[in-house]
Amino acid sequence: RRPGSDSCRGAHPGTGQRACQGVHWRSGNRRGRTGALVYAHENGINYLDLATAGAKTFEYVGKAFSSVRREVFYQVHFGANYETGEYGWTTDLETIKRQIDWQLGKLKTDYIDYGFIHCLDEKSDWEDYQKNGALDYLLDMKENGIVRHIGMSSHTPELAWQILDTGLVDQMMFSINAAYDYQHGDYAIGSASERMKLYRRCEAEGIGISVMKPYSGGQLLNADTSPFGQALTPYQCIQYALDKPGVLTVLPGIRNKADIDALLGFLDASDEERDYSVISSLTPKDVKGSCVYCNHCQPCPAGLNVGLINKYYDLAVIGDTLAADHYHNLEKKASDCVSCGHCDSRCPFHVAQADRMKTIAEYFGC
């Protein structure tokens, strides 16, 4: 499989497809970070997502890869803001310009493989991104050869579809994991089918998908937090994502050399170690009372995106700082719930969503 017009190395044995070996760099121990990145490259990892939790990452990446820049692919996000030293989200044009200049300097590069329209989840986000000039800036960077390909990231299939309609996008970053997709029989409803339709469109149009949150923020690796009531392994989660149409690379978070070694082990894993068919033996009762983000409760009379609010909350409580920031940028938050009961009556998994909105509003403070 080829991302845009560039070749990409690294086959996943047994998947029937070629895929970039990719990672998403997470915060971790300061010592050895650059060395760990060099080690990753030496072992065939050549695709890096740079929507990271902290600003220091860019310096480490620049030191690790400046001498082998042509051998690695960078996803750089036009809308990720690190002016405070930590991740922030913005559609402000001047902030985006400052951030891209700063990131290019720290990365010690004069070009970006994939310039991403960053994390737009609501229609108003996309409208602002165009109105504020951020999209035109990204297009100008591509016209001038600084950006090689345009990508986009979103958690919302409907909006992703709309952005793909522009014909501008070569790559899409999307969350793919069993927790988000789990549906059975009469429960095969809502966003799961929308997501599959989106993946198939990407496959048909030659748009590569890079996968974020393959472990659902760690939820799937722990029996206590997994919606299935039992843990999956990282290799099962990676294979699950790779088997979806259009997927080019899966981007698990890494912190150190040990994480890289664990990830590289996937390439030598047996079919049995990758097999995730256990999911099919689980029945809908296994997830009753847990939101699986199917959005069967939509449309909400008060305008809330109930599934997305739940998703951000579930990720935030297990330590995903980016999810908390995304929540605070939602137009309608849990505190806007009017407890009308519409979602409670429509939820096929019997989640008490009105009560849950109160819990989420209390957690985030809004």
Model region roles, listed by residue range:
Residues Q17-R31, F78-K97, K123-E127, N222-A231:
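Active-site mouth loops of central-metabolism enzymes
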Residues G28-R31, E42, G88-S210:
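Glycine/proline-rich, positively charged
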